[in-house]
Design a protein with these regions (language model features):
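Glycine-/small-residue-enriched transmembrane alpha-helix faces in small-molecule transporters
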Residues: 1-44, 149-176, 197-200, 313-325
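Hydrophobic alpha-helical transmembrane segments of multi-pass integral membrane proteins
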Residues: 8-13, 40-56, 132-135, 155-162, ...
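Juxtamembrane C-cap of transmembrane helices in multi-pass membrane transport proteins
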Residues: 19-35, 48, 87-97, 105, ...
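Specific alpha-helical transmembrane segments that line the substrate/conduction pathway
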Residues: 40-51, 90-124, 163, 253-272
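Hydrophobic transmembrane alpha-helices of multi-pass small-molecule transport proteins
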Residues: 53, 108, 115-116, 125-146, ...
Length: 325
């Protein structure tokens, strides 16, 4: 009973994380349309989020700096690959591919996770997981409106696949992280490392950094540039990453990554509500397929009960169940 409540809490956190991540496109678009470079938008997003999370992270550590130090290698990889790397790879991909194709390649990270669990833990994908993967990928193709002619470039494909690795690392490290390391501390540490990396790349000229303080068009209104910047940093970064880590610790990397696909559905929803971009019938069908894929993977895990007692997400689920009780 308590574990069921913990799992439900994990689903709520995962959907909340996906929804907050889904706002990033709307916030970033308003900045990019006024002359901001994508890299500058990402850099300020991560930098401010790192500052916002610093004090809460220190409070949750309660002086246990040794916990952070013992996990410094994992936090560093998380910051470099899952935060900074993933976004840099994606924006390099969109220089050679359409945004839809780049997103599809990035979300192939869920397939990488299934493969990783097979290779690393011997969790061979069963029929329901395979069916869920196929349904989810088909749903992505429809939601991202990739039916028809699309431009494919090998360099862009490689960057997109690198972004997929970054996405997979996000879920895998979030699931296997030390339960004693608070999600706030993990997110804050990773964002600090990611922000410093992005800023260094910008100073070196490896990433184009262009920004201004002009008013932006957001939700049909002219507002200060600070509105989307705060939205990107607080909602689409600080809150989104912390909720994502907490959810993945409860659900595990595979299930959490499939639930994370709903980010594209929330992105379409926010684009409709705030930018007036009405979703098509094919996109709605794609959304149904994505949700069906998530349901199939959840049913598969429920039937099999394959989580090992020592898995981080099993420990986290037990801890959450205790706290909920």
């Amino acid at each position: 009973m308590l574990e069921q409540r913990a799992t439900r809490a994990g689903f709520v956190l995962a959907l909340f994380s996906a929804a907050t991540f889904g706002t990033s496109g709307t916030f970033a678009t308003s900045l990019i349309d006024t002359g901001w470079s994508p890299a500058a938008a990402v850099a300020i997003r991560i930098s401010i989020a790192a500052v916002l999370l610093a004090v809460p992270a220190v409070v949750t550590l309660r002086g246990r700096w040794n916990v952070l130090w013992h996990n410094i290698r994992m936090v560093t990889i998380y910051g470099l690959v899952a935060i900074a790397g993933c976004q840099v790879f994606f924006f390099n991909a969109v220089q050679h591919l359409s945004v839809g194709v780049a997103l599809l390649l990035e979300y192939m990270g869920i397939i990488l996770i299934v493969g990783w669990l097979w290779i690393r833990n011997g969790q061979r994908p069963r029929r329901l997981t395979i069916a869920g993967s196929v349904a989810a990928v088909l749903g992505l193709i429809l939601v991202l409106n990739l039916v028809g002619d699309t431009h494919i470039d090998l360099v862009g494909v490689l960057w997109g696949l690198a972004a997929a690795v970054g996405l997979a690392v996000f879920f895998v490290l979030s699931a296997k992280s030390d339960p004693d390391l608070p999600p706030l501390a993990m997110a804050s540490g990773g964002m600090t490392i990611g922000a410093v990396t992005l800023l260094i790349l910008g100073v070196l000229g490896a990433l184009p950094m262009h920004a201004n303080v002009d008013d932006v068009d957001f939700a049909g209104h002219q507002v200060s540039w600070l509105v989307p910047v705060i939205g990107l940093s607080l909602v689409a970064a600080a809150i989104a990453y912390v909720a994502g880590i907490a959810a993945t610790r409860i659900l595990g990397s595979k299930l959490a990554s499939f639930v994370g696909l709903t980010e594209v559905l929330f992105a379409v929803l926010f684009a409709w509500l705030l930018l007036g971009e009405v979703p098509t019938a094919m996109q709605l069908l794609g959304g149904v397929l994505i949700l069906a894929g998530v349901a199939l993977v959840r049913i598969d895990e429920f039937r099999s009960g394959t989580a090992d007692p020592g898995d981080s997400h099993t420990i986290a689920r037990s801890t959450a169940a205790r706290d909920l009780g």
